[in-house]
Amino acid sequence: MAVQKSRVTPSRRGMRRAHDALSAKQLSTDPTTGEVHLRHHITADGFYRGKKVIQTKTSAVEED
């Protein structure tokens, strides 16, 4: 069982936890569709940086 050698001070504990904070997701808006998506990811419609890069099931049905 792990046992600490000496007590950890509140300052040391706080310095260790300084990098544990959560940050908000970086979101972008697609210029073509206006859809919000994660940075460097395609939208649900299959657009990336304003261009259609992948054929989605919903767009295949709409084209028929």
From Swiss-Prot:
Protein name, as recorded: Large ribosomal subunit protein bL32
Region Disordered, residue ranges: 1-35
GO cellular component terms, semicolon-separated: large ribosomal subunit
Pfam families, per the entry: Ribosomal_L32p
Biological process according to GO: translation
Family indicated by similarity: Belongs to the bacterial ribosomal protein bL32 family.
UniProt-listed SUPFAM superfamilies: Zn-binding ribosomal proteins (SSF57829)
Keywords: Ribonucleoprotein, Ribosomal protein
GO terms, molecular function: structural constituent of ribosome
UniProt keyword Isomerase present: no
